[in-house]
C-alpha cells in the first residue's frame, strides 16, 4: 500500500494569484516498487481546471517527501491530488481545503533569523495609515526552498542575524 500526505504554503495559508508550494510525503509500504504519477488539479481564474502531473517512483519500503509548485487562481479554495499507478488506476485521492487569506491588504513577510522572536515587531505592523498590515511567517533554513517559486507567497523576506552557511548552494 502506498500512502500520501500533503501540506501547502507556509503556516497553512495560501495567497491566490501566486505559486503555491505543496509538500507531498509518500510512503511505500508494499513489498514491491511503485511507479506512477501524481496528478494535481486546480481551478484557475478563468474557471478552467488545470492539471499538473509529476512522475513518482518509490522503492519497496521507501519514504520520501517532494515539493511541487502550482499556480493558484483567484477564488480557488481547494486542490485535488491523485496518485495513479502505471496503469493510471487511482491509488490515493486527497483534497486540500485551502485557507486563503481573505484580507487583500495583507503583506506576507517571511522572516529568516537565528532569533525569530527578535522580528516579532514586524507582525501585524500597519503601513499607509493602517490600510496595509503585515503577517510575519517565521522561516528556517530547512523551509527555504531550492526553487524560487517556493517563495512566491511572500511579498518580502527579511533576513536578520542568520548564519548563511546553513543554506545549501541550491537555496
Give, region by region, the residue ranges found by the protein language model.
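Short solvent-exposed strand-capping/beta-turn motif centered on an Asx-Ser/Thr pair
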Residues: 11-13, 27-32
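Short acidic, flexible loop segments centered on an aromatic residue
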Residues: 31-47
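Surface-exposed loop/edge segments in extracytoplasmic proteins
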Residues: 46-54, 65, 90-94
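Short, hydrophobic beta-strand segments
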Residues: 54-62, 66-76, 80
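Aromatic-Pro/Gly-enriched surface loop or interdomain linker
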Residues: 76-156, 160-163
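A short, gly/pro- and small-residue-rich
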Residues: 166-171
Amino acid at each position: 500500500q502506498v500512502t500520501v500526505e500533503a501540506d501547502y504554503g507556509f503556516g497553512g495559508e495560501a495567497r491566490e494569484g501566486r505559486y503555491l508550494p505543496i509538500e507531498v510525503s509518500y510512503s511505500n509500504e508494499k513489498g514491491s516498487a511503485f511507479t506512477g504519477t501524481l496528478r494535481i488539479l486546480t481551478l484557475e481564474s478563468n474557471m478552467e481546471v488545470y492539471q499538473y502531473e509529476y512522475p513518482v517512483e518509490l522503492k519497496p519500503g521507501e519514504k520520501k517527501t517532494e515539493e511541487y509548485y502550482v499556480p493558484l487562481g483567484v477564488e480557488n479554495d481547494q486542490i485535488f491530488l491523485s496518485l495513479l499507478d502505471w496503469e493510471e488506476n487511482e491509488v490515493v485521492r486527497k483534497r486540500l481545503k485551502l485557507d486563503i487569506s481573505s484580507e487583500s491588504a495583507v503583506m506576507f513577510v517571511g522572516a529568516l533569523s537565528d532569533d525569530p522572536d527578535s522580528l516579532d515587531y514586524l507582525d501585524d505592523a500597519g503601513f499607509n495609515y493602517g490600510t496595509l498590515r503585515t503577517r510575519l511567517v517565521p522561516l528556517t533554513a530547512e523551509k527555504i526552498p531550492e526553487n524560487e517559486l517556493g517563495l512566491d507567497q511572500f511579498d518580502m523576506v527579511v533576513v536578520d542575524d542568520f548564519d548563511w552557511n546553513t543554506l545549501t548552494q541550491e537555496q
